Structure formats: C-alpha cells, structure tokens
Amino acid sequence: MSPQTETKASVGFKAGVKDYKLTYHTPDYETKDTDILAAFRVTPQPGVPPEEAGAAVAAESSTGTWTTVWTDGLTSLDRYKGRCYHIEPVAGEESQFIAYVAYPLDLFEEGSVTNMFTSIVGNVFGFKALRALRLEDLRIPPAYSKTFQGPPHGIQVERDKLNKYGRPLLGCTIKPKLGLSAKNYGRAVYECLRGGLDFTKDDENVNSQPFMRWRDRFLFCAEAIYKAQAETGEIKGHYLNATAGTCEEMMKRAVFARELGVPIVMHDYLTGGFTANTSLAHYCRDNGLLLHIHRAMHAVIDRQKNHGIHFRVLAKALRMSGGDHIHAGTVVGKLEGEREITLGFVDLLRDDYIEKDRSRGIYFTQDWVSLPGVLPVASGGIHVWHMPALTEIFGDDSVLQFGGGTLGHPWGNAPGAVANRVALEACVQARNEGRDLAREGNEIIREAAKWSPELAAACEVWKEIKFEFPAMDTL
C-alpha cells in the first residue's frame, strides 16, 4: 500500500458527493467573539431546502467544494470551516431567507480587505443552487479590526487640521465634470472656495485625460486654494483625484499633491480596488494628507435588493481599508438612499460602537474599538432648499456637497457658494436656538434669503426642483 493510500485509508476517506448541510449547517454552534459573522439574503433554486442553501454558502465561502476530497483529512475542518448557524425567513418573501454564517478568524489575512472579500463574496455568488445571494451585513470582531490602520486621520483630527467646528463642512464638485482645461478648472475652484465653501472636488471621472492632464490640474488647483485661503483667512481644500491605471502612478500623484502642500487627495475605492486604496491610506497617514473616497460603481454591486453586497458592508470595508470621507447618499437628492437605512450605515461610519438594530438594517452589534471614524458625504442633486433637511439628517459630522447646486447659480460660482454658506449658517444657528429644522426649514431659508441676495436668487431658481422616486433599497 502506498503512503498516499495509507493516508486516505487512515482518515476514513470516502469519495462522492454529499449534502452541504451534513457538515456546514450547525444550528447548535455558539459564535465566538473572534468570529467574523455574516448575514446573507439567500434565494435558493426551487427544490433546494433553506438549510442546504445556507450550508452551501458557508461551505463555498470557506473550506468546502462540490465533492469530498481526500485532503480534507490532512487538516481540521472543524477549526477552519464556515458554519451556517441560524436561518430565518424574510418577512413578506416566500422564497428568501437570511442565513447567518460564522467564519473563524484564521481564514483571513490580517489587514487585508481584499482577502476577506475574496472568500466571503467570491465564487459563492455564482453558485448554481442559488437564484440570488446578497451580503446584508458583516460583524467585524475587534481581533480583526485591530489589524487595520483604518482612516488616515479620522473626524476629530480633520477638524483640528481645518480649524472648523460646530457645523457640517461644505463642498462642491466642479462641473462640467469632463472637458474643462486645467486653467479654467482652477478658476472654477477658486471662485467656489472664495465664496465660502470648505472644499471643491474632482469628479470621479477626472483622472488624466487628453483635455486636462493630472499635473496641470494639480498645479492650477493648488494656486486656487492658496489664493482663496489668503483672501478668506480660512483653510481650504480641493479633492485631487489620485486614482490612476496603476498603483505606482496613483502613488506618484499623491506624492506630488503632498509636495504642493495641499491638504487632501481623493480615490475611487471600488474601481481602484481595496489593495490600492489601503496603500494610499497608509501613505496619507504617514504624510499628513486627508483622503476623500468616492464610491463610483457601488450601485452595480449594492442596488439590487436580492443580489450583491449591501452598501453598509462596503462602508465597513472602507473604514477598515482607510478613508476620511465617503459618499453616502443624501436621502433627499437625486441618488438612491432610504432614510433609516442611510442613517444606519452613516452611524457605522462615524460611531465607535453601534448596537444591532434591524429597523435600520443593522444585523450585528459592531464595536470598532476606537478605529477612527469617516465623515459621510451627502452629494447628488441637492440645493439650498435641502439644507435644513440635510443638516437635520446628517448632523455636524458630515460633508454637504453641492455641485450643480453651486455652479448652477444664475450669478456664477462664487455667489452660488455664498448662497450655500449662508443657508448652512442659518440652519445651524436655528438648530442651536432650538428650532425644528424638519418643520420650520423652509421658513428658516426664507428668513435668511431676506438678508442675502445670493441665497434669494438660488431659492428662486430651485424652488420647484424635486427628486421624488421611491427608494429601491428598503427593509
């Protein structure tokens, strides 16, 4: 008998295919504090029992494969396998279930979102036994989150760097997003910043195209920042998009931004990838740069209710990988975002400890053990009439970003910035005086417009603009 045959015989190997649930469905399992916990929305194919579907998810995202293999006997599956430990039906859905899976921490490389996602949201999402699969939430244990640097700086450090307290920060995406020359682009940045905004932003599409190469844009934007700072006495910034075709080129752009002395750079973290994002976040902490994160491509992943990854998971992953700001929807603007769900993942971005709350889509209690927080960015189809609602919904620790709502002002960019700053200051003052922004918001804006012709003009332009469509992402 060969040594190989002896090994197979000694572990009782029996070739063939057996149900996943025999090994991976463990309803008696008590989860450990060190386990990564996942909540999957599972839609099995007709005839596939929920227990088998949930067990298949646990198996295919951890140690399992479609058939028994003799090398199972060379390791301890009980130590390394994922376990489907609970299954519950989804209210109002006949064939959907929430499958809870526990993964032992040894399955994952320390400090690597890339490795974590490769397992948990890898090949299993194409598994034929499932009609659809969506990752609704993850519980990241402190033992794992402590292996990540997280955001380069966090909310408090950013406020200290900018010397700005007690209100949301104001931003603006430069439009048109594509086609401007570098000098005209810099001019638009200057006008917005001198009008009262804290930040301006490269659109996520802006990298280094023939009409505007990145180095030229960086230089003219830096000039605009320094000129606006000198005139206003406030610290200003522009999100210089360092996203590039290679990690090496991305880092070269970040290094040049640091050499210019600007306060912040930007990255498209989903199209750029988690490995690139984590590398950039480490550089930003080491070199004093803030990092703004755009979520381009997120709706491809998170918008379908039955399949994909919920944005709360992508938000948690970003907090681990690293970013000081991230776009998070508006609730009231043109982009997707239901209020309670949005506030749920906003808290997951900002707060240190978040209790389980299914009414807001939070499946697990999350303890970040002092990992720095991320400022949520509200952006997309918002204007001055939205300011009371945005201030009330997002609170002080946020960035309110008006692109068309600044540059679309009939008098130009600087008056558009003035209108937004006046509206924000009026809302913050009214809130601090105890007024109800949700109920009195329009009146607060009208009162402020009496003393600000720029705000009055903005109110007139956008008085009828609404984006009233039902949210796709509901509980």
Swiss-Prot record:
* Binding locations of Mg(2+): 201, 203-204
Positions of the record's site feature: Transition state stabilizer: 334
Keyword Chloroplast recorded: yes
Self-association or partners: how does it assemble?
Heterohexadecamer of 8 large chains and 8 small chains; disulfide-linked. The disulfide link is formed within the large subunit homodimers.
Please share what else the UniProt entry notes about this protein. Answer: The basic functional RuBisCO is composed of a large chain homodimer in a 'head-to-tail' conformation. In form I RuBisCO this homodimer is arranged in a barrel-like tetramer with the small subunits forming a tetrameric 'cap' on each end of the 'barrel'.
Question: Belongs to which family?
Answer: Belongs to the RuBisCO large chain family. Type I subfamily.
The protein depicted here goes by the name Ribulose bisphosphate carboxylase large chain
Which gene is the coding source of this polypeptide chain?
A: rbcL
